[in-house]
Protein backbone atom coordinates (compact mmCIF):
# COMPACT_ATOMS: atom_id res chain seq x y z
CA UNK A 1 0.00 0.00 0.00
CA UNK A 2 2.90 2.36 0.79
CA UNK A 3 4.42 1.83 -2.64
CA UNK A 4 0.99 2.33 -4.18
CA UNK A 5 0.67 5.66 -2.36
CA UNK A 6 4.15 6.76 -3.45
CA UNK A 7 3.33 5.74 -7.00
CA UNK A 8 0.08 7.71 -6.76
CA UNK A 9 2.00 10.81 -5.69
CA UNK A 10 4.33 10.32 -8.65
CA UNK A 11 1.42 10.06 -11.09
CA UNK A 12 -0.23 13.08 -9.49
CA UNK A 13 2.97 15.06 -9.98
CA UNK A 14 3.15 14.03 -13.64
CA UNK A 15 -0.39 15.19 -14.40
CA UNK A 16 -0.88 18.14 -12.05
CA UNK A 17 -0.43 21.53 -13.66
CA UNK A 18 -1.93 24.95 -13.15
CA UNK A 19 -3.07 25.08 -16.78
CA UNK A 20 -5.45 22.16 -16.25
CA UNK A 21 -7.28 24.04 -13.51
CA UNK A 22 -8.85 26.61 -15.85
CA UNK A 23 -10.97 24.16 -17.83
CA UNK A 24 -13.30 22.61 -15.19
CA UNK A 25 -14.54 25.98 -13.83
CA UNK A 26 -15.00 27.26 -17.39
CA UNK A 27 -17.06 24.15 -18.12
CA UNK A 28 -19.03 24.77 -14.93
CA UNK A 29 -19.91 28.26 -16.15
CA UNK A 30 -20.94 27.22 -19.67
CA UNK A 31 -22.84 24.04 -18.75
CA UNK A 32 -25.45 25.70 -16.53
CA UNK A 33 -28.04 23.14 -15.43
CA UNK A 34 -26.43 20.45 -17.60
CA UNK A 35 -23.38 20.46 -15.36
CA UNK A 36 -23.27 16.78 -14.36
CA UNK A 37 -23.23 15.15 -17.82
CA UNK A 38 -20.71 17.78 -18.96
CA UNK A 39 -18.31 17.23 -16.06
CA UNK A 40 -18.70 13.45 -16.41
CA UNK A 41 -17.55 13.69 -20.04
CA UNK A 42 -14.63 15.86 -18.93
CA UNK A 43 -13.53 13.36 -16.27
CA UNK A 44 -13.75 10.41 -18.68
CA UNK A 45 -11.37 12.00 -21.20
CA UNK A 46 -9.34 14.25 -18.90
CA UNK A 47 -8.68 11.64 -16.21
CA UNK A 48 -9.70 8.12 -17.26
CA UNK A 49 -8.09 8.00 -20.69
CA UNK A 50 -4.94 9.75 -19.47
CA UNK A 51 -4.30 7.33 -16.61
CA UNK A 52 -5.07 4.21 -18.66
CA UNK A 53 -2.73 5.52 -21.38
CA UNK A 54 0.07 6.03 -18.87
CA UNK A 55 -0.38 2.65 -17.17
CA UNK A 56 -0.53 0.73 -20.47
CA UNK A 57 2.59 2.59 -21.60
CA UNK A 58 4.52 1.38 -18.55
CA UNK A 59 4.18 -2.21 -19.82
CA UNK A 60 6.63 -1.66 -22.69
CA UNK A 61 10.16 -0.52 -21.79
CA UNK A 62 10.43 1.29 -25.14
CA UNK A 63 7.08 3.08 -24.89
CA UNK A 64 4.40 3.71 -27.49
CA UNK A 65 6.91 4.59 -30.19
CA UNK A 66 8.12 0.98 -30.25
CA UNK A 67 4.52 -0.29 -30.23
CA UNK A 68 3.66 1.85 -33.28
CA UNK A 69 6.86 0.86 -35.11
CA UNK A 70 5.93 -2.79 -34.69
CA UNK A 71 2.15 -2.70 -35.14
CA UNK A 72 1.62 0.16 -37.62
CA UNK A 73 4.78 1.56 -39.28
CA UNK A 74 7.89 3.58 -38.36
CA UNK A 75 6.75 6.44 -40.62
CA UNK A 76 3.36 6.66 -38.90
CA UNK A 77 5.09 6.53 -35.52
CA UNK A 78 7.44 9.39 -36.42
CA UNK A 79 4.71 11.66 -37.83
CA UNK A 80 2.39 11.00 -34.89
CA UNK A 81 5.08 11.60 -32.25
CA UNK A 82 6.29 14.79 -33.95
CA UNK A 83 2.74 16.20 -33.95
CA UNK A 84 2.24 15.03 -30.37
CA UNK A 85 5.43 16.65 -29.06
CA UNK A 86 4.67 19.87 -30.93
CA UNK A 87 1.23 19.88 -29.27
CA UNK A 88 2.45 19.27 -25.72
CA UNK A 89 5.36 21.57 -26.47
CA UNK A 90 5.77 24.84 -28.37
CA UNK A 91 2.47 25.00 -30.27
CA UNK A 92 -0.01 24.67 -27.41
CA UNK A 93 1.06 23.53 -23.93
CA UNK A 94 4.10 25.80 -23.52
CA UNK A 95 2.38 29.03 -24.64
CA UNK A 96 -0.75 28.03 -22.71
CA UNK A 97 1.15 27.70 -19.43
CA UNK A 98 2.68 31.15 -19.95
CA UNK A 99 -0.67 32.69 -20.91
CA UNK A 100 -2.37 31.03 -17.92
CA UNK A 101 0.31 32.38 -15.59
CA UNK A 102 -0.33 35.87 -16.95
CA UNK A 103 -4.14 35.67 -16.89
CA UNK A 104 -4.31 34.48 -13.27
CA UNK A 105 -1.11 35.91 -11.80
CA UNK A 106 -0.70 39.28 -13.51
CA UNK A 107 -3.79 40.39 -15.47
CA UNK A 108 -6.01 40.93 -12.38
CA UNK A 109 -3.59 43.53 -10.97
CA UNK A 110 -2.67 45.50 -14.12
CA UNK A 111 -4.60 47.95 -16.27
CA UNK A 112 -7.29 46.82 -18.69
CA UNK A 113 -4.94 47.34 -21.62
CA UNK A 114 -2.97 44.18 -20.88
CA UNK A 115 -1.17 43.75 -24.21
CA UNK A 116 2.09 45.53 -23.26
CA UNK A 117 2.04 43.81 -19.87
CA UNK A 118 1.61 40.42 -21.55
CA UNK A 119 4.61 41.14 -23.81
CA UNK A 120 6.75 42.28 -20.87
CA UNK A 121 5.73 39.31 -18.71
CA UNK A 122 6.27 36.66 -21.40
CA UNK A 123 9.66 38.16 -22.32
CA UNK A 124 10.93 37.79 -18.75
CA UNK A 125 9.14 34.43 -18.35
CA UNK A 126 10.63 32.82 -21.47
CA UNK A 127 14.14 34.23 -20.99
CA UNK A 128 14.23 32.62 -17.53
CA UNK A 129 12.69 29.40 -18.88
CA UNK A 130 15.31 29.21 -21.65
CA UNK A 131 18.21 29.74 -19.25
CA UNK A 132 17.02 26.86 -17.08
CA UNK A 133 16.11 24.60 -20.03
CA UNK A 134 19.59 24.95 -21.54
CA UNK A 135 21.14 23.86 -18.24
CA UNK A 136 18.43 21.81 -16.49
CA UNK A 137 19.11 21.24 -12.80
CA UNK A 138 17.53 19.26 -10.00
CA UNK A 139 16.66 22.51 -8.23
CA UNK A 140 13.61 22.82 -10.47
CA UNK A 141 12.45 19.31 -9.54
CA UNK A 142 12.83 20.15 -5.85
CA UNK A 143 10.82 23.35 -6.26
CA UNK A 144 8.14 21.39 -8.10
CA UNK A 145 7.93 18.83 -5.30
CA UNK A 146 7.34 21.62 -2.80
CA UNK A 147 4.98 23.67 -4.95
CA UNK A 148 2.73 20.84 -6.12
CA UNK A 149 1.34 19.79 -2.71
CA UNK A 150 1.09 23.43 -1.53
CA UNK A 151 -0.79 24.44 -4.65
CA UNK A 152 -3.06 21.37 -4.48
CA UNK A 153 -3.96 22.13 -0.85
CA UNK A 154 -4.73 25.77 -1.74
CA UNK A 155 -7.04 24.67 -4.56
CA UNK A 156 -8.85 22.13 -2.35
CA UNK A 157 -9.45 24.78 0.34
CA UNK A 158 -10.63 27.24 -2.33
CA UNK A 159 -13.06 24.70 -3.78
CA UNK A 160 -14.56 23.72 -0.40
CA UNK A 161 -15.01 27.31 0.77
CA UNK A 162 -16.24 28.42 -2.65
CA UNK A 163 -18.93 25.75 -2.88
CA UNK A 164 -20.10 26.72 0.62
CA UNK A 165 -20.05 30.47 -0.12
CA UNK A 166 -21.41 30.82 -3.66
CA UNK A 167 -24.99 29.88 -4.59
CA UNK A 168 -25.38 30.75 -8.25
CA UNK A 169 -26.26 27.03 -8.78
CA UNK A 170 -26.06 26.80 -12.54
CA UNK A 171 -28.40 29.68 -13.35
CA UNK A 172 -26.40 30.55 -16.47
CA UNK A 173 -28.01 29.40 -19.69
CA UNK A 174 -26.20 26.26 -20.89
CA UNK A 175 -24.29 26.51 -24.15
CA UNK A 176 -25.59 23.01 -25.03
CA UNK A 177 -29.14 21.93 -24.37
CA UNK A 178 -29.17 18.12 -24.28
CA UNK A 179 -27.45 15.58 -22.08
CA UNK A 180 -25.64 14.05 -25.08
CA UNK A 181 -24.32 17.41 -26.22
CA UNK A 182 -23.28 18.26 -22.66
CA UNK A 183 -21.37 14.98 -22.32
CA UNK A 184 -19.77 15.40 -25.75
CA UNK A 185 -18.71 18.97 -25.02
CA UNK A 186 -17.26 17.93 -21.66
CA UNK A 187 -15.46 15.03 -23.34
CA UNK A 188 -13.84 17.37 -25.89
CA UNK A 189 -12.97 19.89 -23.16
CA UNK A 190 -11.16 17.06 -21.36
CA UNK A 191 -8.85 16.84 -24.39
CA UNK A 192 -7.58 20.30 -23.40
CA UNK A 193 -5.80 18.91 -20.35
CA UNK A 194 -3.38 17.26 -22.85
CA UNK A 195 -2.74 14.58 -20.22
CA UNK A 196 -3.39 11.57 -22.47
CA UNK A 197 -0.95 12.94 -25.05
CA UNK A 198 1.58 13.64 -22.31
CA UNK A 199 1.14 10.05 -21.07
CA UNK A 200 2.23 8.73 -24.47
CA UNK A 201 5.34 10.91 -24.33
CA UNK A 202 6.30 10.45 -20.69
CA UNK A 203 5.38 6.82 -19.93
CA UNK A 204 9.04 5.70 -20.17
CA UNK A 205 10.09 8.42 -17.71
CA UNK A 206 7.27 7.37 -15.39
CA UNK A 207 8.27 3.70 -15.63
CA UNK A 208 11.89 4.51 -14.81
CA UNK A 209 10.82 6.47 -11.74
CA UNK A 210 8.43 3.71 -10.67
CA UNK A 211 11.16 1.07 -10.86
CA UNK A 212 13.23 3.06 -8.37
CA UNK A 213 10.64 2.23 -5.71
CA UNK A 214 12.03 -1.32 -5.70
CA UNK A 215 9.24 -3.76 -6.58
CA UNK A 216 10.13 -7.39 -5.93
CA UNK A 217 8.27 -8.83 -8.93
CA UNK A 218 6.00 -7.94 -11.84
CA UNK A 219 2.83 -8.77 -9.90
CA UNK A 220 3.65 -6.28 -7.14
CA UNK A 221 4.67 -3.70 -9.74
CA UNK A 222 1.42 -4.01 -11.70
CA UNK A 223 -0.72 -4.12 -8.55
CA UNK A 224 0.87 -0.95 -7.19
CA UNK A 225 0.61 0.86 -10.52
CA UNK A 226 -3.08 0.01 -10.95
CA UNK A 227 -3.92 0.91 -7.35
CA UNK A 228 -2.05 4.18 -7.75
CA UNK A 229 -3.85 4.83 -11.03
CA UNK A 230 -7.24 4.29 -9.42
CA UNK A 231 -6.38 6.46 -6.42
CA UNK A 232 -4.98 9.20 -8.67
CA UNK A 233 -8.03 8.99 -10.92
CA UNK A 234 -10.40 9.37 -7.98
CA UNK A 235 -8.35 12.27 -6.63
CA UNK A 236 -8.34 14.15 -9.91
CA UNK A 237 -12.03 13.40 -10.49
CA UNK A 238 -12.92 14.94 -7.13
CA UNK A 239 -10.66 17.92 -7.86
CA UNK A 240 -12.16 18.49 -11.32
CA UNK A 241 -15.74 18.07 -10.12
CA UNK A 242 -15.06 20.49 -7.26
CA UNK A 243 -13.55 23.09 -9.61
CA UNK A 244 -16.45 22.59 -12.00
CA UNK A 245 -18.95 23.16 -9.19
CA UNK A 246 -17.03 26.28 -8.19
CA UNK A 247 -17.51 27.65 -11.72
CA UNK A 248 -21.12 26.49 -11.79
CA UNK A 249 -21.97 28.26 -8.51
CA UNK A 250 -19.90 31.42 -8.99
CA UNK A 251 -21.89 34.33 -10.45
CA UNK A 252 -20.01 35.38 -13.57
CA UNK A 253 -21.14 38.80 -14.90
CA UNK A 254 -22.95 38.72 -18.25
CA UNK A 255 -20.38 41.03 -19.84
CA UNK A 256 -17.60 38.58 -18.92
CA UNK A 257 -19.54 35.64 -20.37
CA UNK A 258 -20.12 37.63 -23.57
CA UNK A 259 -16.45 38.62 -23.91
CA UNK A 260 -14.73 35.90 -25.97
CA UNK A 261 -11.29 37.27 -25.04
CA UNK A 262 -11.74 36.51 -21.32
CA UNK A 263 -11.03 32.96 -20.15
CA UNK A 264 -13.91 32.05 -17.86
CA UNK A 265 -11.89 29.51 -15.87
CA UNK A 266 -9.09 31.96 -15.09
CA UNK A 267 -11.70 34.59 -14.18
CA UNK A 268 -13.51 32.24 -11.76
CA UNK A 269 -10.25 31.17 -10.08
CA UNK A 270 -8.88 34.68 -9.59
CA UNK A 271 -12.17 36.36 -8.61
CA UNK A 272 -13.38 33.57 -6.30
CA UNK A 273 -10.00 33.63 -4.53
CA UNK A 274 -10.29 37.40 -4.13
CA UNK A 275 -13.86 37.06 -2.79
CA UNK A 276 -12.88 34.40 -0.22
CA UNK A 277 -9.34 35.35 0.83
CA UNK A 278 -9.16 39.03 -0.16
CA UNK A 279 -6.44 40.71 -2.23
CA UNK A 280 -3.60 38.92 -0.42
CA UNK A 281 -5.14 35.56 -1.24
CA UNK A 282 -5.44 36.54 -4.88
CA UNK A 283 -1.77 37.59 -4.94
CA UNK A 284 -0.76 34.29 -3.30
CA UNK A 285 -2.75 32.32 -5.89
CA UNK A 286 -1.12 34.33 -8.66
CA UNK A 287 2.40 33.63 -7.39
CA UNK A 288 1.63 29.91 -7.01
CA UNK A 289 0.18 29.71 -10.53
CA UNK A 290 3.14 31.56 -12.05
CA UNK A 291 5.71 29.31 -10.33
CA UNK A 292 3.80 26.09 -11.09
CA UNK A 293 3.31 27.08 -14.74
CA UNK A 294 6.97 28.08 -14.97
CA UNK A 295 8.28 24.71 -13.77
CA UNK A 296 5.93 23.02 -16.26
CA UNK A 297 7.15 25.25 -19.10
CA UNK A 298 10.81 24.46 -18.43
CA UNK A 299 10.04 20.73 -18.22
CA UNK A 300 8.17 20.80 -21.54
CA UNK A 301 10.93 22.74 -23.32
CA UNK A 302 13.48 20.19 -22.06
CA UNK A 303 11.36 17.13 -22.98
CA UNK A 304 10.46 18.43 -26.45
CA UNK A 305 14.03 19.52 -27.24
CA UNK A 306 15.42 16.15 -26.10
CA UNK A 307 12.92 14.28 -28.30
CA UNK A 308 13.70 16.30 -31.43
CA UNK A 309 17.45 16.21 -30.78
CA UNK A 310 17.29 12.42 -30.48
CA UNK A 311 14.98 11.98 -33.49
CA UNK A 312 16.60 14.62 -35.72
CA UNK A 313 20.19 15.10 -34.44
CA UNK A 314 21.13 17.48 -37.29
CA UNK A 315 20.39 20.32 -34.86
CA UNK A 316 21.84 20.55 -31.36
CA UNK A 317 19.81 20.37 -28.16
CA UNK A 318 20.52 24.07 -27.50
CA UNK A 319 19.28 25.04 -30.97
CA UNK A 320 16.00 23.22 -30.37
CA UNK A 321 15.56 24.95 -27.00
CA UNK A 322 16.04 28.33 -28.71
CA UNK A 323 13.53 27.47 -31.46
CA UNK A 324 10.86 26.11 -29.11
CA UNK A 325 11.29 28.95 -26.62
CA UNK A 326 10.84 31.55 -29.37
CA UNK A 327 7.82 29.75 -30.85
CA UNK A 328 6.22 29.42 -27.41
CA UNK A 329 6.89 33.11 -26.71
CA UNK A 330 5.33 34.20 -29.99
CA UNK A 331 2.18 32.10 -29.62
CA UNK A 332 1.72 33.00 -25.93
CA UNK A 333 1.35 36.65 -26.93
CA UNK A 334 -1.85 36.04 -28.86
CA UNK A 335 -3.57 35.49 -25.49
CA UNK A 336 -4.89 32.51 -23.54
CA UNK A 337 -8.30 32.24 -25.23
CA UNK A 338 -6.82 32.25 -28.74
CA UNK A 339 -4.18 29.67 -27.78
CA UNK A 340 -6.96 27.39 -26.54
CA UNK A 341 -9.10 28.02 -29.63
CA UNK A 342 -6.27 27.25 -32.06
CA UNK A 343 -5.36 24.04 -30.22
CA UNK A 344 -8.79 22.45 -30.69
CA UNK A 345 -8.35 21.17 -34.30
CA UNK A 346 -5.05 19.45 -33.49
CA UNK A 347 -6.52 17.86 -30.36
CA UNK A 348 -9.61 16.67 -32.26
CA UNK A 349 -7.17 15.01 -34.66
CA UNK A 350 -4.70 13.50 -32.18
CA UNK A 351 -6.95 12.28 -29.38
CA UNK A 352 -8.99 9.68 -31.32
CA UNK A 353 -5.74 8.31 -32.78
CA UNK A 354 -4.22 8.12 -29.29
CA UNK A 355 -7.24 6.33 -27.82
CA UNK A 356 -7.32 3.89 -30.76
CA UNK A 357 -3.61 3.20 -30.26
CA UNK A 358 -4.15 2.43 -26.57
CA UNK A 359 -7.06 0.11 -27.44
CA UNK A 360 -4.88 -1.74 -29.95
CA UNK A 361 -2.05 -2.18 -27.43
CA UNK A 362 -4.40 -3.41 -24.68
CA UNK A 363 -6.37 -5.82 -26.87
CA UNK A 364 -3.26 -7.17 -28.60
CA UNK A 365 -1.82 -8.21 -25.22
CA UNK A 366 -4.62 -10.78 -24.96
CA UNK A 367 -5.91 -11.31 -28.51
CA UNK A 368 -3.93 -12.10 -31.66
CA UNK A 369 -4.42 -9.31 -34.20
CA UNK A 370 -3.37 -8.95 -37.82
CA UNK A 371 -0.85 -6.20 -38.57
CA UNK A 372 -2.86 -5.35 -41.69
CA UNK A 373 -5.97 -5.05 -39.52
CA UNK A 374 -4.22 -2.78 -37.03
CA UNK A 375 -2.98 -0.59 -39.88
CA UNK A 376 -6.53 -0.49 -41.27
CA UNK A 377 -7.82 0.57 -37.84
CA UNK A 378 -5.40 3.48 -37.62
CA UNK A 379 -6.11 4.53 -41.21
CA UNK A 380 -9.86 4.62 -40.54
CA UNK A 381 -9.63 6.54 -37.26
CA UNK A 382 -7.10 8.96 -38.80
CA UNK A 383 -9.37 9.57 -41.80
CA UNK A 384 -12.42 10.18 -39.60
CA UNK A 385 -10.38 12.54 -37.41
CA UNK A 386 -9.17 14.54 -40.42
CA UNK A 387 -12.67 14.78 -41.90
CA UNK A 388 -14.15 15.78 -38.53
CA UNK A 389 -11.54 18.52 -38.05
CA UNK A 390 -12.13 19.90 -41.58
CA UNK A 391 -15.90 19.89 -41.06
CA UNK A 392 -15.85 21.54 -37.64
CA UNK A 393 -13.05 24.04 -38.35
CA UNK A 394 -14.29 25.28 -41.73
CA UNK A 395 -18.02 24.77 -41.04
CA UNK A 396 -18.51 22.40 -43.98
CA UNK A 397 -22.16 21.41 -43.55
CA UNK A 398 -21.99 18.46 -45.96
CA UNK A 399 -19.19 16.86 -43.92
CA UNK A 400 -20.79 17.71 -40.58
CA UNK A 401 -24.09 16.15 -41.69
CA UNK A 402 -22.33 12.89 -42.64
CA UNK A 403 -20.39 12.77 -39.36
CA UNK A 404 -23.60 13.49 -37.42
CA UNK A 405 -25.15 10.31 -38.83
CA UNK A 406 -22.43 8.10 -37.33
CA UNK A 407 -23.25 6.36 -34.02
CA UNK A 408 -22.20 8.31 -30.90
CA UNK A 409 -21.57 11.48 -32.94
CA UNK A 410 -23.53 13.57 -30.40
CA UNK A 411 -21.12 12.37 -27.72
CA UNK A 412 -18.14 13.38 -29.94
CA UNK A 413 -17.25 9.70 -30.40
CA UNK A 414 -18.11 9.25 -34.08
CA UNK A 415 -14.80 7.45 -34.63
CA UNK A 416 -15.32 4.83 -31.89
CA UNK A 417 -17.65 2.29 -33.55
CA UNK A 418 -15.67 2.19 -36.85
CA UNK A 419 -12.53 1.65 -34.76
CA UNK A 420 -14.12 -1.28 -32.92
CA UNK A 421 -15.35 -2.79 -36.21
CA UNK A 422 -11.82 -2.61 -37.66
CA UNK A 423 -10.39 -4.24 -34.52
CA UNK A 424 -12.90 -7.08 -34.86
CA UNK A 425 -11.83 -7.51 -38.49
CA UNK A 426 -8.22 -7.66 -37.26
CA UNK A 427 -9.04 -10.84 -35.35
CA UNK A 428 -9.89 -12.77 -38.55
CA UNK A 429 -7.37 -11.43 -41.06
CA UNK A 430 -4.26 -13.59 -41.76
CA UNK A 431 -0.86 -13.35 -40.03
CA UNK A 432 -2.28 -12.66 -36.59
CA UNK A 433 -0.08 -12.57 -33.50
CA UNK A 434 -0.24 -11.36 -29.92
CA UNK A 435 1.76 -8.40 -28.70
CA UNK A 436 4.91 -9.12 -26.74
CA UNK A 437 4.50 -9.40 -22.98
CA UNK A 438 7.69 -8.29 -21.20
CA UNK A 439 8.88 -10.01 -18.06
CA UNK A 440 9.73 -7.95 -15.00
CA UNK A 441 13.48 -7.79 -15.69
CA UNK A 442 12.84 -6.32 -19.15
CA UNK A 443 10.60 -3.53 -17.84
Which sequence ranges carry the predicted segments?
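Hydrophobic, membrane-embedded alpha-helices of multi-pass small-molecule transporters
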Residues: 8-16, 86, 161-168, 177-243, ...
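Selective recognition of specific alpha-helical transmembrane segments in multi-pass small-molecule
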Residues: 48, 52, 150-162, 225-251, ...
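Membrane-water interface regions at transmembrane-helix termini and the short interhelical loops
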Residues: 59-63, 67, 125-147, 212-215, ...
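TM-loop-TM module centered on a large, flexible mid-protein loop between adjacent transmembrane helices
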Residues: 64-70, 239-294, 345
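Hydrophobic alpha-helical segments and their helix-loop junctions in multi-pass secondary transporters
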Residues: 90, 94, 152-178, 196-197, ...
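Membrane-interface loop-to-helix entry segments
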Residues: 133-162, 343-355, 374-382
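Hydrophobic, small-residue-rich membrane helices and short re-entrant helix-turn-helix hairpins
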Residues: 135-146, 183, 206-235, 254-260, ...
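A generic transmembrane alpha-helix motif of multi-pass inner-membrane proteins
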Residues: 165, 370, 374-443
